[in-house]
Structures are given as structure tokens and as C-alpha cells.
């Protein structure tokens, strides 16, 4: 009974504080509330009136997740062979940062999306098969997320616009306080979104994925490992990868030496990847029976550098 009374009292207090905040009589920063002076009230009313166009909140959320929480990661190094894979980032279908041709994809669906409720398990599974298969992460809902993001954007815009060097000292102080509150707000958002990413539902290339990792960065690593492994199923045909510079240097040296024995040895070395050679021979044999003729450069770009192969150019036998 005591706990129930406390919960009821807490709800009443929160409702009262919410009304005072809505009327701009108090200001909120996290779990702290402050009564406002007349000038502070006027400024806070102006901040609340700042327009935030559609999509800006999702772009900010995506920027915080991918740049702050995930430390700006744009590549994944696959553990089995140390190959690097670029990946693109999206948040509620808005691109975050430059998009790289041929990159993998990590798509984030958040409560800010108009279609959030439509992303049930079946839709998440289906959508994750698009574009050759990608990572789709659906964040859980948190009632403070949208409010904090919107307040952050409104405050940032207002302070930047208002700071023109002609303000009286009391107004400058209020704006400095607003900017400091916003810095703390972004820190809170980074922590909150880190927790939300770690707890998100993940779907990869048409399969729900139960993530074992607990930190956001390791969650990303685990999802990327699964995506690469299941997208590039013939990548394992390359048992040995020779660094491109070393391979070219070796070939040039042997050809210049005009040593037939060494040349024969060079070609024998190619057999360290017999499955890859067999795959290539089979495709070349099949293609040679039908026009148009094969072009090596096009062969690499249209077949062996994309799923299911992802073979480095220099490693193609």
C-alpha cells in the first residue's frame, strides 16, 4: 500500500511539473527542474517556438548513434581474413554521412519514424533482405527521447541565431546557461542511445539475430560479422590472401628474371586456393560458350568483388 501511495504521489507530482513546464513557468534539465525569471520565461517561450523541420530529429539521432555512440565507424574488419568492408549508415531511411558505392548497410529504425509501429517482426525481416541483405536494428521506445532531441535542436538553433553581440549581459548569461544545458542534454542522449542500441532488436539479411554482446560497439561488430559471413558465402574459397603490393612485386621480379623454373613455381603457387580456381574456371568455361566475350575488368567488378565472393582484386587467380 505504501509503495502504491508513493507511485500515485509521484505521478501527481510529475503531472504538476509537466503543466508548469508547458506553461513555461519552470525549465527542465534531465531530472532537475528550475523556476524561471520573467526574462528566462520569455526566452524559453521563444525556444519552444523554434521550428524543427521533419527529418531533422532523425538525422540528429542518427548522427549521435553513428558518430558518438559507435565512434564514427565506417568499416568492418572481418575476423576470418582481416578484409575491410565499407558500410553505409541510415536512420529512419535518412542517409547519415556520405554513402559509398557497393558498401554494406546498417539501417536504424527509431520511434521518431512515422512508420515505427508498422515495423513488426515480419516487416523487419522482409526489409532486411533488401539491397542484397543488410542490418536492420529497431530501437525500443523511450518517452524522453523525442522530447530531448527536439529541445536540443530548438535550443541549438535559437542560441546560434540570437548570439549577435548586441545583447545585454543578463541575456548573454541566460544563453550561456541554455548552451550548457544543451551540452548536458547531448551527453544524456548519447548515454541513452547507447543503451537503446545495445537493447535493440536486430534483423540481418532476412533473419532475426539474437545479439550476445552488451556494448554498442560490440553489438555492431557481432551484427557485421554475421552479415559478412552470410552475404559472402564464397569468400572462404580464398584460403590464402597475398597482399597486393607483395604479389605484384613477386610477379614482376620473376618475369624480369626470365627464369622458367621460377615462372612455373609462380603458377603452381596459385593452387593454394583450389576452390577459388575451380569456381573461376567453371565460370569462364561456361561464359566462353556464349557471347559476349569476357572482359577481365568487368568480370572482377560484376562477379568477384560483390556477393557472394568479395574477393580482393589482387587475389583473384
Predicted segment positions?
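Extended alpha-helical interface modules used as scaffolds for assembling large macromolecular complexes
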Residues: 1-317
